[in-house]
Amino acid sequence: MGVHLEVFRLSTHWFLAITALVTNGLQYEAIRMISPKMLPAISAYAVSGLYLFQFNGMRQAMAISIFVFGVALILRGHRFGWVFLLTAALIHSSTLIVLPAFILSRRFQQRNTFNIRIVLLSGGVFLALLLISTALATFLTDLVGDKYGSYLDQNMGSGRGRLIHLALMLMVVWFLQSTELPNQLRCATRFYSLGLGAQVVGLQLAVLDRVTLYFVASLPMFICFLLAHGSRARHIVLWLGIITYFFISLTHYGDLIPYEWTLS
């Protein structure tokens, strides 16, 4: 980020302000393009962890917002949305891990989600291979760069906040399976369901846990449909889960990525 400050000759305050405007502005536009109701969508964005993350991971937060904006364009039928996805990859290399998942989510168009058990099992198998396979760890290091890849050699958990988030994602995917959705939106919900696998990996490797945020970014797009179906009790449980995770993020952010298990 220091390079950008020198190139554009911006003060730190102005640079932070412009970055925040771009990050949140693109997220807002993506939500506006897809969600028929803004209040629940913006509320979900504010308390799902995405908003707080940008205070700690500014560059990746911008990449996520560009990625989500591109996804929204693609869902609206605009092929040049792929340009934004590639741009996001240029800004932060973690996007390269997520791109194949989005491409996969464009298949099986009649399904709201992928099979939960298969996704969880795939995440567990990938984590096991990553922990025992030097070749796979080396490949990911080359993909995301030495700055982040060096963390793959370390056995780092992501705290109890990640367990709560995994439970929240499981609940959302379970609710999605019984929710009527527009055909164009099913790609986003299938993509979100693949985030379960990323979160399983993130339970043990904090650096890959941040990849989960790309999947979480699609939640504001479809949350109003979750709230339009099911009982009031289901809606209350959903919001309680989201708000609980938000307060853990807000009051004890260090417990989300302390590089050790806090349950022990």
What are these regions (language model features)?
Residues 117-125, 231-250:
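Signature aromatic-anchored transmembrane alpha helix within multi-pass, membrane-resident enzymes
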Residues 81-84, 94-105:
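Transmembrane-embedded, aromatic-rich helix segments that form part
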Residues 74, 89-92, 201:
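Transmembrane helix irregularities
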Residues 99-216, 252-264:
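Alpha-helical transmembrane segments and terminal signal-anchor/GPI-anchor hydrophobic tails
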Residues 17, 28-48:
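Transmembrane-helix signature of polytopic, membrane-embedded enzymes
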